Amino acid sequence: MRLVLVAGPTASGKTALAVALAQRLGGEIVNADSQQVYRGLDVGTAKPTAEERAAAPHHLLDLVEPGEGMDAARFAALADAAIADIAARGRVPIVAGGTGLYVRALLHGVVEAPGRDPELRRALEAEAARDGRPALHARLAAVDPAAAARIRPNDLVRVVRALEIAAGGRTPSELYQAHAFREDRYDAALLALDPPRAELHARIDARVRAMFAGGLLEEARALAARFGGALPARLPIGYAEAAAHLRGELDLEEAIRRVQVAHRRYARRQVIWLRKERGVVWIAPPYDPEALARRVEKR
């Protein structure tokens, strides 16, 4: 089945281009941003605006509550269903997002890994709370150095999952190597936005300031009230810093600076991930929706 993928780093303009392509190709947009699946976290995840949603139908937004799990396998299954529905109605599926795990799972399938073990997860999370996240990361490094090199010490969710997988008898790296992601599940036109680094950083910095001015603090306040002040570990970038500012632990400028840095680092990881994907066409700005639509139609 054919589809269009609009990928690229955060703040590069994916949503605007996806909407423009949808209008020209008769398409509908399937979200592939892991942060936009959470209900109620709109400003801090830069979800499509009401105007953008009115301009083109969107799928796979607002799927789960904050703190709930959403992994690549579940995303791929939901995306498969949405894509099939769109195509069955004679429309063009346009996948938009920069979450590498989600994109890879959709295009090439998922690794068959052991299921979740709630008891082990609780024990590992308690260990991290007692000894610190770097200590748990060091434990992963002893078991699977390659996985530890890919995962940041503070990314508790991924460190715990990697150790959970390793407890099943094979390390994450062994499973990934065996899978190799060779299968192409879709005939996809892969477009990746590639703005110059200075331009991208300026866009990120401006977006983060707009988030703080436009409702991120209010969303963080509502989360803190809902969870009794202790925010869930699995939250998009920016909410922990916004909550820290509300508690008086960070002044506003420092909170903004930290979120800007975190988004820049995330953008870098997104680009590195996409560089590994085969068949990607990198698009430099200014983006020309008309020319790109013609390019897609000629495939």
Swiss-Prot record:
Question: What enzyme class is recorded for this protein?
Answer: transferase
Q: Which cofactor does it need?
A: Mg(2+)
Q: Does the keyword Secreted apply?
A: no
Query: In its UniProt record, which GO terms are filed under biological process?
Result: tRNA modification
Instruction: Describe the function of this protein.
Output: Catalyzes the transfer of a dimethylallyl group onto the adenine at position 37 in tRNAs that read codons beginning with uridine, leading to the formation of N6-(dimethylallyl)adenosine (i(6)A).
- Subunit structure, interactors included: Monomer.
- Protein name in the entry: tRNA dimethylallyltransferase
**The species this protein was found in:** Anaeromyxobacter dehalogenans (strain 2CP-C)
Classification lineage = Bacteria, Pseudomonadati, Myxococcota, Myxococcia, Myxococcales
